[in-house]
Amino acid sequence: MEITWYGQSCFRLTERGSASVVTDPFDHKVAGYGALKLKSDIVTISHNAPGHNFVNGVKGYKHLLDGPGEYEVGGVFITGVRTNGKNQTGQLRNTLYVFDYDGITIAHLGDLREVPSRSQVDAL
């Protein structure tokens, strides 16, 4: 398992024989990091903001996950759970993702604003 951090909330997860994942790709003009030039099978977006949803920084992806649900892609089981955190219009705005790579489990919290509730943790 290889986990690479690119800045902000953007990581790439790779495991031999499984789909690769990029989380929360950022627009470098907003985030203040170098421009992303990544390749991945899956992109996850925790919420709709330029620092977390710049899919133009990722090439080759076939699956874009931008909300809660259960997914299975390329040997990776992914669970997305809506968590608390409100945007300027008062809407729920963050999805926490849990990735299971054949026994290796990783959580990406996105732009989590507070500790998840018991029911949110149970949903994982």
Show where each model-derived region lies.
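Terminal membrane-proximal soluble interaction domains of membrane-associated proteins
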Residues: F54-V55
